[in-house]
Amino acid sequence: MILKEKRIFIVEDNMQNRLVFQMALIRHGASVDFERWGRDTLYHLQNLSRVDLIVLDLMLAEGVTGFDIFDQIRGLVKYNAVPIVAVSAMDPSIAIPRLQKQGFSGFIAKPIDSHQFPKQLATVLSGETVWSVGERTA
């Protein structure tokens, strides 16, 4: 179980994606918490004892973006060093340079590969970055 005892917080507005993420991660030993829209992310994070990794959708409903949420999370002392990975259908050639500049720990293109997803997050948890654009890796 490559994610045993790891707590992963996911911000994702699509229920089907949340279920796919959750199933893949729980199967590998992680505990998973969710925020659907992004607007209550800081509230939820402040009420958790710890989070080992945060997964952010970049294109959320109601005008909130993962880029905005990233900056808000980095403003919390408790979470300013927690790795944050973007998971998005956004064009990687546009997203990745911006994510790297902003300080994200990785990008995983949607649709995710549910077999690779836990391994990719484990890689980030080990201190490396992951820039996955589907069939190839940047």
Locate the predicted segments by residue:
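Conserved acidic carboxylate
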Residues: 12
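Two-component/phosphorelay signaling modules centered on CheY-like receiver
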Residues: 15-33
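Alpha4 helix (beta4-alpha4-beta5 surface) of REC/receiver domains from two-component response regulators
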Residues: 67-68, 90-108, 119
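Acidic, metal-coordinating helix/loop segments flanking the phosphotransfer/catalytic sites
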Residues: 34-53, 61
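His-Asp phosphorelay/catalytic-motif detector in bacterial-type signaling
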Residues: 50-52, 77-83
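Short amphipathic alpha-helix used as the core "switch/output" element in two-component signaling
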Residues: 65-80
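C-terminal output helix
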Residues: 112-121, 129, 133
